[in-house]
Every structure is written in C-alpha cells, then in structure tokens.
C-alpha cells in the first residue's frame, strides 16, 4: 500500500496518453474510454506535450498503413468480416491484431444475433476454435504482443481452458500492463486470495487498480476500500470508476445510504454517465426509493434506451412496482445485448422467483454462476429455489457456497443455519445462529432463531439468555408476535425460579401485547400470590418501587442466564 503514494503522477499521465493512442488504434474502445477518464482526472497535471506527442508519433510505419486505415474504418462501422478480409495477409502486430480481433467480434456478434433463450455452447463454436488455433500458432512463433496475448487469453477462457488462459493473460499483463481489458479478463479467473497471491504480476502502477478490484471481488472489503482511498489521494478523487468502486465497497459494508450519496456525487460530476448506474438502481431498489428509481429510469432512457445499464435500471423499476412480466422483458433485452451480463442473469432469477417459475429461476441463477462463480446472490438464489422445491440437500449445498463467498454476511449464515435446522443438524444450526450474532445480525432474527431452537431442545437457561438479549433491543425487533412470546417465556422462566421481581417486570411487558395480555394477567396474579406467601413466611415487606429489577440486574450476583451466557461472545467453527 505504501508504494501507491510514491508514484510519479507525471509518469502515470504519460503512460495513459500512450496507452489511449495504442488501444484506440486497435479498436479496444472500452479500455480506451476507461483510460481517457483516468487521464481526464489528471487534467491539471502539466506535461511537456512536445515530448509526449513525439513519442506517440514514433509508431511503426509500414506498407500496411493504407490497408490498416481501410480496415479500421470498416471495424469502426462494425463491418467486422470486411475488416478481417482486407487484413488477412497482414503481418505487423497492430494490423494482425485488428484482423484477429475482427474475426473474434464477428463471431460474437453473430452468436448474439442468433441467440435463443438458451445460450450457445462455446465448445461447439468452430469459428472460435479456429481463431484459437491461429493465435496458438502465432504464440508458439513468438509473434504475439501484449494485445495479441490478451485476445489469445480471451479465446482460451471462452473455450474453458482456464489454467492456460490464466498463464497467457498474466503474460499479456507483463507485455502490455496498460490494457485494462486484460486485467478484467484475468480477474474473472481468480477464485480466492491464495490464487491471487500466487500470480506473478508486473510491478506496474496499474497493478494497484487490479488489486483493488480483486479485493472487492473476493469480499476483502477493508483492503479494497483502503486502496481506493489511496488511489483517490493520488489524483483520482473525481474519477467516476474509482468513485463507483468506492460506493460498491461502502455498500458491501452495509452502508447503503453512504453508497447512494456517492452515486449522486458521480451523477453531479457526469450527468450523462450510465456506467455502474445499474448498481445504483439496485441500491435504490433495496431502499424502496420509488421516486428516485423512477427518475433514474427516465433519465437513463433519455440518454440511451438500448444500453445494458438502462435495461437493467428499467427492469428494477418495474420489479419494484411488482410488474414482474415487464421486468423480465427488460432483463431479457439486456441479455440479448450481452449474454455475459452478470447482473441481468441474477435479477432475472429473482423475478422468476417472484413469479414462482422455479425452472426459469434455476436456469437464470446457473447462467449467472457460469458468468461469475463468485456471485453469491446466484448461489443464495439457488438455495432458496431448491428449498421451495422441497430439495433440502441441494439447498444446503448452495447456501454453503453463498456463505463461503460472504462469510461475514449474516443473511448467508442464517440461511445456512435454517437449512441445517430443517435437516435436524442442530449443532451446526446453533453454530450458524451464533455466527450470525457475532458478525452483526442484519435482519435482527438470529437471536430469536437461537432462542426458539434452544426452547425446542428444552435447554431453558440458554433459551432465556438468548431471549434476554433479544428483548433488550425491542425497538429493532418489529415482529410483535416474537417479542410477546419472548416476554412470556422470560416471565415463566423467572417465575419457576422464584425470581419474582424479574418475572413481574416481564409480565408487565406482556400486558402491552394483545397476544399475551390475558396470560399476563394470570401470571401477575400468580406472582402476587407467591409474593404474599413470601411475606407471610418471612414477615418482610419490600418496597418494590425503590429499584427497577431490570436496571439493577447488573448489580446482582444471581444465576440469571443472561449473565451466564452471551451468544455474542461465542465463536463459530463450521462443520465441513
């Protein structure tokens, strides 16, 4: 992390200007845009432009320049077959790349045009296999530069040759570290921190953008957020990508309001930006901010109604309005534009779940996992779907995968605990509920699950301890039925143990609920009778108004289970 601060910002800007030129010449439009936005963030950094432009103009000049100029115009107009045809005999790295890349994009375009509801099998793509064979031949002959290696890695990845693809993409990152597309393709192949740390990556400042991206992908939120803060301090504090990644990191830390404010800042800086606005729409959906989501959908449609992000935003808008048919239509539209669009597959699965179309949900979630195996939402969705289908063993497997990806998300841990409980794996369920308490119970149900399970097991001391912790935050616990049951249980528990002050306190609480009001009256009568007997036998009259039994609880040294056991202090050791 420390070496981030030592970067020569002028050198960074020079690298950006050179890379923008190189990527633009090769038709790598998304990377060109990404680099240009980074460069714009450094617009106040002054350079000797004569040196920079002279360096850029020293590109190779060859007899293929006229062919390149013609082919590049065809490429820019998406006439990929024509571009590939006219460059077939070219051998210089730049024009050769344009030929191979045109063939690749032609195949991708035709695949999308011919796509049905079932995505095509990449292993049956003869054009892709032929392209990969040509790239392999060039690679063996040492003819591939950093950009050619990138394309070779992409084709290997498409053909599911994962290990070879990883090696080739790492090689590409050494030869051309400024190509962001290479880093993103490599990121999709990394499944855990161990694999990330085993890679031999170039010692280049772009590596830090990649590492920050990977930290978020691997749910290493604190490291990722710290690195993005460092990048902002380098001069990228207004860069839309860095801000969006920061918002995503903040969202992962469950600070949705702060994440929304960060996206509002991005819109203020760049009002026509649609990049990452699908993520923003997800946050508005979670917070049920209908007006803001409607405004975002309207604005996105006006900017570009056929953008992936727009389709996703409008789909979320209709989903929030419970118009699931229209939501499905827009998510399908997004997938028609890009079958690898992860967010749309996951959201489509959610919509099918709402429509009780379990087959559609399973297919969508599986496709999301094919695109990115780290998408915990898809694993979690599959767990829910198989639960509905009364297939608990499948559900348990998918919940385990979701929990491994999000080990500190109480929702994943709770779902796993419930799955264990349904299969009578009680000790595993208890561990999960304790874990959910320890990591911060988002939904506020872990304690009640723990208490209820202990009550079923007849472990009354443990149950009372959990119920005691549960009722201490009664304003958070909105479910009146659960709260009233907890108060009734604690009343009966303390009554059996002749702890009349506490029993009286909880019985008074029971009077506030219609469900327990009558029972509370009966319990209070029992408490009064017991008190009378105590007074008769001991002839001691206590002034009940002097102390509040609950406030005074900490000062007493009795056997109250809340003092013996706190679920929040136990550790979690999952069963393999």
Predicted regions and their residues:
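Conserved structural position within tetratricopeptide repeats
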Residues: 140, 173-174, 233, 265-268, ...
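Position-specific recognition of the canonical hydrophobic site in helix A of tetratricopeptide repeat
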Residues: 75, 104, 157, 216, ...
């Amino acid at each position: 992390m420390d070496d981030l601060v030592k970067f020569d910002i002028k050198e960074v800007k020079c690298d950006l200007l050179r890379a923008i030129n190189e990527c633009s010449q090769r038709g790598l439009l998304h990377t060109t845009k990404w680099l240009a936005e980074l460069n714009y963030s450094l617009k106040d950094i002054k350079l000797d432009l004569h040196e920079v432009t002279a360096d850029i103009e020293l590109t190779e000049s060859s007899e293929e320049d006229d062919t390149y100029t013609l082919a590049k115009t065809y490429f820019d107009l998406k006439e990929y077959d024509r571009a590939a045809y006219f460059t077939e005999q070219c051998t210089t790295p730049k024009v050769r790349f344009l030929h191979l890349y045109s063939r690749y994009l032609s195949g991708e375009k035709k695949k999308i045009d011919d796509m049905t509801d079932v995505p095509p099998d990449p292993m049956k793509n003869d054009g892709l296999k032929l392209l990969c064979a040509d790239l392999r031949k060039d690679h063996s002959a040492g003819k591939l530069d950093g950009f050619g290696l990138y394309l070779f890695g992409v084709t290997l990845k498409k053909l599911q040759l994962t290990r070879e693809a990883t090696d080739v993409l790492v090689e590409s990152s050494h030869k051309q570290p400024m190509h962001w597309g290479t880093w993103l393709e490599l990121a999709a192949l990394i499944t855990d921190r161990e694999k990330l740390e085993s890679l031999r990556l170039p010692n280049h400042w772009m590596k830090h953008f990649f590492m920050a991206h990977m930290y978020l992908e691997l749910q290493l939120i604190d490291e990722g957020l710290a690195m993005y803060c460092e990048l902002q301090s380098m001069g990228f504090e207004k860069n839309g990508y860095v801000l969006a990644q920061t918002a995503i990191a903040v969202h992962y830390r469950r600070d949705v309001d702060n994440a929304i404010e960060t996206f509002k800042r991005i819109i203020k800086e760049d009002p026509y930006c649609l990049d990452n606005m699908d993520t923003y729409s997800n946050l508005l959906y979670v917070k049920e901010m209908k007006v803001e989501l409607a405004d975002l959908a309207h604005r996105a449609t006006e900017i570009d109604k056929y953008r992936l992000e727009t389709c996703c935003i409008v789909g979320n808008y209709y989903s929030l309005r419970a118009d699931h048919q229209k939501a499905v239509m827009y998510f399908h539209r997004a997938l028609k534009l890009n079958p690898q669009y992860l967010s749309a597959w996951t959201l489509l699965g959610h919509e099918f779940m709402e429509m009780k179309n379990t087959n559609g949900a399973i297919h969508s979630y599986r496709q999301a996992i094919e695109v990115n195996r780290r998408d915990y939402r898809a694993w979690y969705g599959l767990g829910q779907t198989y639960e509905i289908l009364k297939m608990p063993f499948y559900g348990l497997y998918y919940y385990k995968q979701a929990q491994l990806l999000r080990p500190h998300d109480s929702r994943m841990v709770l779902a796993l605990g419930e799955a264990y409980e349904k299969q009578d794996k009680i000790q595993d369920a208890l561990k999960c509920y304790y874990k959910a308490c320890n990591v911060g119970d988002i939904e506020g149900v872990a304690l009640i699950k723990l208490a209820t399970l202990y009550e079923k097991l007849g472990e009354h001391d443990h149950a009372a301890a959990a119920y005691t912790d549960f009722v201490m935050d009664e304003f958070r616990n909105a479910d009146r039925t659960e709260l009233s049951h907890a108060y009734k249980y604690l009343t009966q528990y303390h009554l059996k143990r002749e702890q009349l002050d506490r029993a009286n306190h909880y019985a008074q609480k029971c009077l506030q609920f219609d469900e327990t009001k009558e029972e509370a009256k009966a319990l209070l009568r029992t408490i009064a009778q017991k008190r009378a007997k105590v007074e008769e036998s001991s002839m001691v009259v206590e002034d009940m108004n002097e102390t509040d039994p609950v406030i005074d609880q900490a000062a007493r040294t009795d056997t109250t289970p809340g003092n013996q056991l706190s679920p929040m202090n136990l550790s979690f050791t999952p069963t393999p």
